[in-house]
Amino acid sequence: YKDNALVGTAPDASFYLFRTEDGANENPVEESYWVEAAEKADSLGVDVINTSLGYFGFDNTAYSHTYNEMDGKTAFMTRGAEIGVSRGMIVVASAGNEGATANPNIAVPADGISVLTVGAVNASKTVTSFSSIGPSFDGRVKPDVMAQGQSVVLSDSSGNIVTANGTSFSSPVMAGMVASLWQAFPNKTNKEIKDLIIKSADRYTNPNAQYGYGIPDFSVALSNGLGVNDFSVNDFFMYPNPTSDICTVSLSEKLDEGVLRIYSIRGQKIAEQKISKTSPTI
């Protein structure tokens, strides 16, 4: 958050920053550093982990991953991410920026079965050329969802408002939305929140390797989370419908009176009134 300049997707959240990356080198031990950080995050009560990094190739190519290891259960870091989810956290991870390379697929830990993997689209909702693709080696839909990762507005280390590209930015955009949605439903599990997000996405019924399930609509996710099962009764009916003023409630012969309560889609009670056959309007 920057006053009068920038509001992120979870501006009132509390954050811990864990630096597990060795910027000068790329070695397998960094996966262990990440798992150690995830364990520490769990001990601190963290709900959502954002991971803006991924591992596939290492400086010593003998240790590099292969695509057949992107199965959600082989890489050390991915297994650590799965343990984090089993502890109740939501792990959000960048899909990777290798979409235009000879090895365009997702990297560790984006292959995780329970990890919410985020690819990148531009402001026109078109997948970027660099966004790594799926599926996982075992055929699961990856990435899971998409968020803006091209020309993302952000604050740099000096506090300047700039734009940048990468799934390293689409992932935290999504992680903030995840946190905000979970705040609306604090009693739901991490799996339930993830399911709400995926089922709200615009390609949920027709996913593919570039977009996964697509771009989530968090207003739909919120509505679905608040939803109740449809039901019908024959003891009364209301008219006119729709109305912007007075509404009449017609009770059946077996009902003489009752209490009518009206709730908004957010679950807030907006009206309550006793009604009867002699006083049927609200």
Task: Name each model-derived stretch.
Residues 1, 15-22, 47, 105, ...:
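Hydrolase catalytic cores
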Residues 1-30, 44-47, 58-61, 86-88, ...:
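Subtilisin-like serine protease catalytic core
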Residues 49, 141, 256-260:
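Short beta-strand/loop motifs in extracellular/secreted proteins, especially
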Residues 71-88:
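Catalytic-core regions built around general acid/base machinery
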Residues 8, 14-19, 47-52, 83-85, ...:
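Structural recognition of the beta-strand scaffold that forms the well-ordered cores
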Residues 28-34, 38, 58-66, 93-113, ...:
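Active-site-adjacent substrate-recognition loops and nearby beta-strands
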